[in-house]
C-alpha cells in the first residue's frame, strides 16, 4: 500500500495519516489509546466490538450523567462496528474488513487471533502488506507470554512502583495508568515504523509487518538509567519522593500558600540561585557534588526561604532569573492553564448525546495541520451497517453474514 497515493478527498488538513485504514480489536486503554493517536493523525480507525456489550471501558468510570470519560477520551475519531467472532460469519466479515486494511491493532490474549483465523500468518495470505500490531501484558515471547497483565500489576512487576512514592515510604503506583498509556504510544510508534518500512520495501523484498509490545516491556523501558546503574554498581533505589536522584536541588518545595517545583540544572547557575534566595550560606556548596553530600542541610535552607513568600512571588522571581519552575497543578489547573489552550491540548467538543465536554488533543503539533475531533466517541455498533455494506460488496454477502449471526442476534 502506497499511502502517498491514497485518496485524501483533496483535503490537505486531514493529517499525516490521511488515507491509512486501521482496524482495531482492542479494549480498555492501551490498544484504544494507540488507535486514538493514529486517528488523531488522520487515519480512519474502525473499532470492532462485541455485540451488546462492547468495550468494557464503556461502562467504566460512568458518572451519574451516564458519561464514561474513560471511554470517550480513548475512542475519539473512531467508528464502531459490532461483530460476533464466535460465529464463522462474524470471523469471515472481519477477515474481509482486514483484507483491505493497512493496519490491524489487537490486544487479545496470547494465541487467540490464531485460533480465530485472524492471526498474522492468516491475514498476510490475503493482505501481504498489512501492519499487525499485537499488544499483550508480557508480549508474545518468554515464559510469561500467556499470563494476563494489567497496568498496576505491571507497574509493580516492572519496577516503576518501587521508585515511586514518598522518600523512605512504601512504593505506590503512578497516579495515571502509565503502563497502558506508554504501551499505546509504543504501539503507535511501531505502527508508524512498519508503515514506513512497507513504503520503502521493494517489490522483490518480503515485508514482515507484524510487531508486538507488552505492558511489561514498556514499564521496564521506563526504568531507563536505573537498569544501567544497577549493572554498574548494584544500586537499588527506593521511592524517590519528589527529589531528583542526582541533582540537588531539583524537587517540590512548600511556599507560604502552596507548593512549586524548581531546580538548578548546572553549577554555573548556582550563584544566581543563591542571589535570588538571598541566602549567602548556600554559597558554601558551589558544586552539585557538594550539594549532594550536604543535601539535607541545603534543602532545609531552601525550604525555609521558600516558605516566606507566596507561590506566585517565587514563580515570578525564578522566571525572571531564568530558572525552570512551575506550580503543582491539579486537573482544574491544567485545563485552565493558558499553555494548554495555546497548544490545543484539550479540544472542546459537542457530543450529540452527552453534550459539551473536553477531549484530549494530540501532543505533536504538525505544521499545516489543525487537530480536530472528526468523530465523537462512537455509540456501540453505530457504523456497522455503513462499513459492512461497503466491505460485503453486494447485498447477498451482507445478508449471508447477517443470517449467519455475524452482527449478533437482535
Regions found by a protein language model. Name each.
Residues 1-206, 379, 385-410:
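N-terminal helix-loop segment corresponding to the beta1-alpha1 unit
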Residues 52, 138-139, 215-222, 257-259, ...:
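Glycine-rich beta-alpha junction loops
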Residues 140, 168-178, 199-219, 235-245, ...:
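Conserved Rossmann-fold dehydrogenase catalytic segment
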Residues 240-245, 250-251, 354-357, 376-379:
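Short Gly/Pro-enriched turn/cap motifs at secondary-structure boundaries
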Residues 248-321, 325:
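Aromatic-enriched alpha-helical interface/lid elements that frame and gate functional surfaces
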Residues 321-374:
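A glycine-rich dinucleotide-binding beta-alpha-beta segment and adjacent secondary-structure elements
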Amino acid at each position: 500500500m502506497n499511502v502517498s497515493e491514497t485518496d485524501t478527498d483533496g483535503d490537505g488538513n486531514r493529517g499525516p495519516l490521511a488515507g491509512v485504514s486501521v482496524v482495531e480489536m482492542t479494549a480498555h486503554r492501551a490498544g484504544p489509546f494507540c488507535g486514538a493517536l493514529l486517528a488523531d493523525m488522520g487515519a480512519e480507525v474502525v473499532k470492532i466490538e462485541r455485540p451488546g456489550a462492547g468495550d468494557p471501558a464503556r461502562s467504566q468510570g460512568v458518572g451519574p450523567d451516564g458519561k464514561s470519560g474513560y471511554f470517550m477520551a480513548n475512542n475519539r475519531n473512531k467508528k464502531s462496528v459490532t461483530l460476533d467472532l464466535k460465529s464463522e460469519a462474524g470471523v469471515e466479515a472481519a477477515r474481509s474488513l482486514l483484507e483491505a486494511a493497512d493496519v490491524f491493532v489487537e490486544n487479545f490474549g496470547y494465541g487467540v487471533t490464531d485460533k480465530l483465523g485472524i492471526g498474522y500468518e492468516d491475514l498476510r495470505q490475503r493482505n501481504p502488506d498489512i501492519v499487525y500490531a499485537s499488544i499483550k501484558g508480557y508480549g508474545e515471547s518468554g515464559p510469561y507470554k500467556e499470563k494476563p497483565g494489567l497496568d498496576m500489576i505491571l507497574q509493580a512487576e516492572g519496577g516503576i512502583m518501587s521508585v515511586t512514592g514518598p522518600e523512605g515510604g512504601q512504593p505506590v503506583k503512578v497516579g495515571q495508568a502509565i503502563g497502558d498509556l506508554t504501551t499505546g504510544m509504543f504501539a503507535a510508534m511501531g505502527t508508524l515504523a512498519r508503515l514506513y518500512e512497507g513504503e520503502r520495501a521493494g517489490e522483490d523484498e518480503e515485508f514482515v509487518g507484524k510487531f508486538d509490545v507488552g505492558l511489561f516491556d514498556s514499564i521496564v523501558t521506563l526504568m531507563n538509567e536505573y537498569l544501567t546503574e544497577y549493572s554498574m554498581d548494584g544500586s537499588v533505589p527506593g521511592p524517590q519522593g519528589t527529589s531528583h536522584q542526582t541533582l540537588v536541588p531539583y524537587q517540590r518545595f512548600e511556599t507560604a500558600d502552596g507548593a512549586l517545583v524548581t531546580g538548578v540544572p548546572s553549577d554555573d547557575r548556582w550563584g544566581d540561585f543563591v542571589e535570588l534566595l538571598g541566602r549567602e550560606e548556600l554559597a558554601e556548596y558551589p558544586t552539585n557534588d557538594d550539594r549532594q553530600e550536604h543535601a539535607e542541610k541545603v534543602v532545609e535552607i531552601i525550604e525555609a526561604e521558600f516558605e516566606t513568600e507566596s507561590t506566585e512571588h517565587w514563580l515570578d522571581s525564578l522566571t525572571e532569573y531564568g530558572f525552570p519552575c512551575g506550580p503543582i497543578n491539579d486537573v482544574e489547573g491544567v485545563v485552565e492553564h493558558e499553555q494548554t489552550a495555546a497548544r490545543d491540548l484539550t479540544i472542546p467538543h459537542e457530543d450529540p448525546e452527552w453534550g459539551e465536554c473536553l477531549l484530549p488533543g494530540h501532543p505533536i503539533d504538525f505544521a499545516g495541520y489543525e487537530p480536530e475531533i472528526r468523530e465523537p466517541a462512537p455509540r456501540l455498533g453505530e457504523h456497522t451497517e455503513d462499513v459492512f455494506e461497503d466491505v460485503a460488496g453486494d447485498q447477498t454477502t451482507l445478508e449471508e453474514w447477517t443470517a449467519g449471526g455475524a452482527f449478533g442476534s437482535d
